Amino acid sequence: ASFBZAPAGBSASGEKIFKTKCAZCHTVBZGAGHKZGPNLHGLFGRQSGTVAGYSYSAANKNKAVNWEEKTLYDYLLNPKKYIPGTKMVFPGLKKPZZRABLLAYLKESTA
């Protein structure tokens, strides 16, 4: 399903998804250091590959995508297809509900 057809997200469900599938490599806490992946605090409205102190792949820097709900929804379906050459090893979330839930959580937790 495209972003326009995405269901409304549930942030409580999204938090569970984040903790089980994302938190090993990412944090959302303001001022926290990077893990295997960059800190996601301030994610919305930010350009890919621009967080200070994190070593991004050239692919992430060169993609120069602005992270918003639609771009993240598409990216999270298949990160390696969206940004070929990304270091992110996560295969993606195939279910539209899971992507919508994760985005609802990220919107709240990274602001």
From Swiss-Prot:
Pfam family, one: Cytochrom_C
Lineage: Eukaryota, Viridiplantae, Streptophyta, Embryophyta, Tracheophyta
Disulfide pattern: none
GO cellular component: mitochondrial intermembrane space
Xref: Gene3D superfamilies: Cytochrome c-like domain
Entry binding sites for heme c: C22, C25, H26, M88
Keyword vocabulary terms for this entry: Acetylation, Electron transport, Heme, Iron, Metal-binding, Methylation, Mitochondrion, Respiratory chain, Transport
Organism the protein comes from: Nigella damascena (Love-in-a-mist)
Family: Belongs to the cytochrome c family.
Function: Electron carrier protein. The oxidized form of the cytochrome c heme group can accept an electron from the heme group of the cytochrome c1 subunit of cytochrome reductase. Cytochrome c then transfers this electron to the cytochrome oxidase complex, the final protein carrier in the mitochondrial electron-transport chain.
Protein name (record): Cytochrome c
Post-translational modification (record): Binds 1 heme c group covalently per subunit.
Modified residues (N6,N6,N6-trimethyllysine): K80, K94
Compartment(s): Mitochondrion intermembrane space
Modified residues (N-acetylalanine): A1
GO molecular function: electron transfer activity; heme binding; metal ion binding
